Amino acid sequence: MSRAANIRDAAADQAAVIAFLMLPESYPDRPAEVGRIDTHGAAIFLAGGLAYKLKRAVKLAYLDFSTPEKRKAVCEREFALNRPHAPKLYRRVLAVTRGDDGALRLGGPGEPVDWLIEMERFADDRLFDRLAVAGRLDAALIEKLAEAVERFHAAAPVFNEPRWPASLGPIVGNVVRAMSGIDQAARIGAGMQGYATALQERLYGHRALLSERRDAGLVRRCHGDLHLKNIVLIDGAPCLFDALEFDEDLARIDVLYDLAFLLMDLWHRGLKAEAHALLNHYFSRDAADIEWRGLALLPFFLSLRAAIRAMVGLDGLPLAEGGKRAALAAEIRDYAQLAEALLSPAPPMLIAIGGLSGTGKSTVARAIAPDIGATPGAFVLRSDVERRLMHGAGSAERLGADAYAPESRNAVYSRLLDKAAAILPTGHCVILDAVFREPHQRERPKALAERLGVPFLGVWLEAPQERMLARVAARRGDASDADASVVLRQLESTVPPSDWHKVDASDAAEETASKLRTLL
């Protein structure tokens, strides 16, 4: 019997289980109705306060759920992987049994014929893809998300094994083989064949760095399927669930490749500021040199993630009809074009934004950063944040006078420049956000840019005194300790630079940001 016939028979055998699970009387609580959600590899049945996940009897290029034994193993694997991180969601693995009377039951006596993961239900509007559509991914929630991902990666088992980066080869190979189909389905033309060649070249060129990061412990048992639909808000905190369970090679990966899926998902949805904030907060701690240098891999990782989404869409195209087929073809085209754009970012540059306290430096820096350089935008290095890291202080803790002494100020500027010197060679842009009151402070970033061979832009923000005073008075929970007295002292003793671009920052932040964009 052919493989296709075996798979058809497996699907036919499972049809009775699916019909059983659609009946309200099949469940202990007898819900009024049963809902159903279908994905490539699973059917999820929504019954009252619980959800039951059934692995579909399918065999695809990247997964094999064709027998009950394989479905049991993968259910147990998914439960073991996700329960530690989402204990409030994952309840147990449960058999669908057939009794002596031939009837199917949940967890009843008789022979197991299929397997389910029993989960707590949650409101759909708590999924992060729904929060994104509703415009509810604010800065505070993005920070929580970055911290949740960082905790997940910190707790993940390290795999220092030679299969990485070799395991990326088949993934890239599958993408390359799919390119002609993507060209045809998305009506792009022959452009994706050139992309396929470039993707292979990047993998070859990055082998040494990929291996070095593996040896440094940055290849771990990651989530593997980290996008917005697999994150839910539980008790006000992001909860990662549905980690990839069917192929260890797809999950034993570089932590930055894991994060890249989430960054790409945000970027593809047009949430550029959110993607930028996520990456910046993920790296807001003091990172090791190998972590910074790994940023050179990010364009490749992001591009590969987008190309894989195009390939997965191509797999589903034969089953789509009518308007759904046209929509899927458009989505494939979007992902393919995004993959191509992500692989070849603009070159790096160094930008210094100076000005007295209250001129809006940090707000403007965050506003323009997503539009600058490699996706998801320029790294913003802020002196107030570096000062707190240097002194081990939290964001709500007011620093003492010694933190602002000349030696401390010089040390803060050195930290800014050291981090910029680590980031710029990876191809990413950097924005330095500091007052830059002293001439020697302004000379240092320019000298760094010249040493690294990247363009430099110095911007000096100016605003009326009353505007600056109003802004510092309105700050809440900000990293800066500056108040009205600081602003007044700065006004008395600061001479603006003559060789930086002066920008009027008295208007709203977006208007000031528009002025800076014209300089870029």
Kindly give the residue locations of the regions a language model identified.
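Conserved phosphate-donor/acceptor-positioning beta-strand/loop module used by diverse small-molecule
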Residues: L452-V472
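ATP/Mg2+ or Mg2+-diphosphate-binding catalytic cores
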Residues: M311-L356
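Loop/turn-to-beta-strand initiation segments
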Residues: T426-V430, P455-L457
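Conserved ATP-binding subdomain of kinase catalytic cores across diverse folds
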Residues: V17-H223, L228-L304
